[in-house]
Amino acid sequence: MKTAIFTVVLALAVFAVLSFGWEANEKALSEEFTELIHEKEAASETEARECRYFWGECHDHMPCCDWLVCGYKWPITYNICVWNRTFPEK
């Protein structure tokens, strides 16, 4: 009887250690994934765009893409890039 109880307690201790190791590994993976996402986000923010995309705010110093034109669209109170009814050539 003592051996059975000792075996059960030992098995529970082993499962607790394995569970703790799994949680630590999962947390490290989660932190690594979060770090990778922030790294990608920072890299995309530093890239300069050549032109503003559809419905992007535009001014003289921020031109729209070729198939868009900077125009005023009610009820928006600032100029945005709107479609000029042409398609970009490939």
From Swiss-Prot:
Keyword vocabulary terms for this entry: Disulfide bond, Ion channel impairing toxin, Knottin, Secreted, Signal, Toxin
The organism of origin for this protein: Cyriopagopus hainanus (Chinese bird spider)
GO cellular component: extracellular region
Membrane-crossing residue ranges in chain numbering: none
Signal peptide limits: 1-19
Summary of the tissues where the protein is detected: Expressed by the venom gland.
Protein function: Ion channel inhibitor.
UniProt cross-references to SUPFAM superfamilies, sorted A to Z: omega toxin-like
Family per similarity comment: Belongs to the neurotoxin 10 (Hwtx-1) family. 13 (Hntx-13) subfamily.
One Gene Ontology MF term: ion channel inhibitor activity
Chain residues in the propeptide: 20-50
Compartments in which it is found: Secreted
Protein name according to UniProt: U7-theraphotoxin-Hhn1i
Domain of life: Eukaryota
Entry's free-text remark on domains: The presence of a 'disulfide through disulfide knot' structurally defines this protein as a knottin.
Disulfide topology: 51-65, 58-70, 64-81
InterPro entries for the chain: Huwentoxin-1
